[in-house]
C-alpha cells in the first residue's frame, strides 16, 4: 500500500505517460527514434524522494533530435547561413552597367582636370568617351559572326603602312597620287575601293600640316599617325573581302621604291603630255637617230636607212637605174659585196656618180660572151629579115620542125662553151617573134 501512495513514483508514472501518449508535442520526431533508451528506469535512482527529481525529467530538458540534412526545419531561415537570393535579369544588367556608369564620369572628370597642353591624352580621352556614349564597345563584343547568305552590306577598313622609314628619300606619296591625282583616281576605279593617303607627311604644305595637327580637330587626327594608305570597302561580306584583297594587291605595287618601273614611266609620259611636250614617241626617235652622223640636208623626208626611191640605190645595183645593158663595167664588178653591204651609200641620193669606179680585170669568158651587145645591135634586124622571108611559108607552124631543134641546140652549145668566133646572135633567136601568133609555137 505504501508503494501505491508514494508521491515520487506517482509523479514518475504521470510524466512517462505524458511523453508516450502526447502526439502533438514540441518535437514530433521523437517517434522516429525508438532505439533511444527511455530515461524512466534511471530517474528514480538519481532524483528519488522529492519533486525536484521529477522536474529534471521533464521533456523540455531533452536534447533536440537529429534531422536529415535534406529536410529543412521550421526555422531554417534563422538558424545557419542564409542562401543568396536570386535577382531578376534587370537587376543583373544594372549590376553589370555599374562599372561603365562609374567609368564614364571618371573619364569626364579626368578630362576636365587634365591640362590642355596634353593634346594626345585629351584626344584619347575624347575617343574613349565617345565609344562609351555610343555603346561601340558592346557592339564589338557582340558582332563576332558573319552571315554570308544575307545581302547586308558591311564596311571594311585597313591601313597599309608606307615604308618611309626604310626608304626615306623615295617619294611614295607622289607615286601613289600621280600627276594631278589621276593615278589614284584610276586605282580607285579599277579596285572599287576608296583609297587615300593619310598620316604624317601626307600633305604637301608642312606648315599647314603642323597647324592642323596641333589644332586637335578629330578630322585631322590621322596626322598623328605614321604615313599609311587607308583603304575602305563597302559591300556584302564575300565581295567586300575580295575587293579588299584586290585593292591591297594593287597598292602593294606602288610601294616598291623603283623609279624605272612601268608605273613611273607611264607617269612621266603623262606628265610630259600634260605640260605640252610633243609626243614621247617622236622624242625618242629623234634621240635615237641623233646617235649617228647626220647627213647633209637630204631631199627625202624619211629617216635613216631609207634612201631614194626603190630603183637603183636601195638594192645597191646602180645598173638598173640609168646604165644601159651594154655596160661592161657593172658586169665585171660584182656589186653585192661592195655596195649592198655598206650602210653609207644607202642614205645618199647621188649614187649614180659612184659608177666610174676603178674596174677590176674580169674573166675572159664573160668578155667573149657579150650577149648584151648582140641584143642592142642586131636583134631588130634579124626579126625584120626573118619576117620578110617566112611570112608565106606554113611549115613554121609544125611542132616538130627540124630547123627549130637545130637552132636551139646550136645556141646552147655555142653560147655556154664560148667557141663562137663572132658575137652575133644565133638564127633561132628571132624565131620567138614569129611564134607569138600561135599559142603552141614555143614547143
From Swiss-Prot:
Omega-N-methylarginine: residues bearing it: 282, 284, 291, 310, 315, 320, 325, 331, 340
UniProt domain KH: residue ranges: 171-197
Skewed-composition ranges (Low complexity): 81-94, 283-293, 307-316
Location of Phosphoserine modifications: 18, 20, 29, 58, 113, 150, 390
Residues where Asymmetric dimethylarginine is found: 45, 52, 304, 331
Dimethylated arginine: residues bearing it: 320, 331, 340
Main location: nucleus
Protease in keyword set: no
Region listing for Involved in homodimerization, in residue ranges: 100-260
Protein's name according to its UniProt entry: KH domain-containing, RNA-binding, signal transduction-associated protein 1
Originating species: Mus musculus
Lineage, highest ranks first: Eukaryota, Metazoa, Chordata, Craniata, Vertebrata
Amino acid at each position: 500500500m505504501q508503494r501505491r501512495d508514494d508521491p515520487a513514483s506517482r509523479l514518475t508514472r504521470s510524466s512517462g505517460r505524458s511523453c508516450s501518449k502526447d502526439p502533438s508535442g514540441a518535437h514530433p520526431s521523437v517517434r522516429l527514434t525508438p532505439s533511444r533508451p527511455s530515461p524512466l528506469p534511471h530517474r528514480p535512482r538519481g532524483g528519488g524522494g522529492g519533486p525536484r527529481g521529477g522536474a529534471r525529467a521533464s521533456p523540455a530538458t531533452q536534447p533536440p533530435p537529429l534531422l536529415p540534412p535534406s529536410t529543412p526545419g521550421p526555422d531554417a531561415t534563422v538558424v545557419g547561413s542564409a542562401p543568396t537570393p536570386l535577382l531578376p535579369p534587370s537587376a543583373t544588367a544594372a549590376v553589370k552597367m555599374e562599372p561603365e556608369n562609374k567609368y564614364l564620369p571618371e573619364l569626364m572628370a579626368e578630362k576636365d582636370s587634365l591640362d590642355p597642353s596634353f593634346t594626345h591624352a585629351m584626344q584619347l580621352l575624347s575617343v574613349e568617351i565617345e565609344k562609351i556614349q555610343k555603346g561601340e564597345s558592346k557592339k564589338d563584343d557582340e558582332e563576332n559572326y558573319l552571315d554570308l547568305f544575307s545581302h547586308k552590306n558591311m564596311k571594311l577598313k585597313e591601313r597599309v603602312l608606307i615604308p618611309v622609314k626604310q626608304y626615306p628619300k623615295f617619294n611614295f606619296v607622289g607615286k601613289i597620287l600621280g600627276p594631278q591625282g589621276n593615278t589614284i583616281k584610276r586605282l580607285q576605279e579599277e579596285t572599287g575601293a576608296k583609297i587615300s593617303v593619310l598620316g604624317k607627311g601626307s600633305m604637301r604644305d608642312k606648315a599647314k600640316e603642323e597647324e592642323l595637327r596641333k589644332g586637335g580637330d578629330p578630322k585631322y587626327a590621322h596626322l598623328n599617325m605614321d604615313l599609311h594608305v587607308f583603304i575602305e570597302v563597302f559591300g556584302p561580306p564575300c565581295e567586300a573581302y575580295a575587293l579588299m584583297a584586290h585593292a591591297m594587291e594593287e597598292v602593294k605595287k606602288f610601294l616598291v621604291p623603283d623609279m624605272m618601273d612601268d608605273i613611273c614611266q607611264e607617269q612621266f609620259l603623262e606628265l610630259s603630255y600634260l605640260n605640252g611636250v610633243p609626243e614621247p614617241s617622236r622624242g625618242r626617235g629623234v634621240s635615237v637617230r641623233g646617235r649617228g652622223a647626220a647627213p647633209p640636208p637630204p631631199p627625202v623626208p624619211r629617216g635613216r636607212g631609207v634612201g631614194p626611191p626603190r630603183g637603183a640605190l636601195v638594192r645597191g645595183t646602180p645598173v638598173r637605174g640609168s646604165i644601159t645593158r651594154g655596160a661592161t663595167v657593172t658586169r665585171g664588178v660584182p656589186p653585192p659585196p661592195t655596195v649592198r653591204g655598206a650602210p653609207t651609200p644607202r642614205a645618199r641620193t647621188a649614187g649614180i656618180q659612184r659608177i666610174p669606179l676603178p674596174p677590176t680585170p674580169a674573166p675572159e669568158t664573160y668578155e667573149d660572151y657579150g650577149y648584151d651587145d648582140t641584143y642592142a645591135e642586131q636583134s631588130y634586124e634579124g626579126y625584120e629579115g626573118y619576117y620578110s622571108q617566112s611570112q608565106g611559108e606554113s611549115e613554121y607552124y609544125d611542132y616538130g620542125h627540124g630547123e627549130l631543134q637545130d637552132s636551139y641546140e646550136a645556141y646552147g652549145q655555142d653560147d655556154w662553151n664560148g667557141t663562137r668566133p663572132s658575137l652575133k646572135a644565133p638564127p633561132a633567136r628571132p624565131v620567138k617573134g614569129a611564134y607569138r601568133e600561135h599559142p603552141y609555137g614555143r614547143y
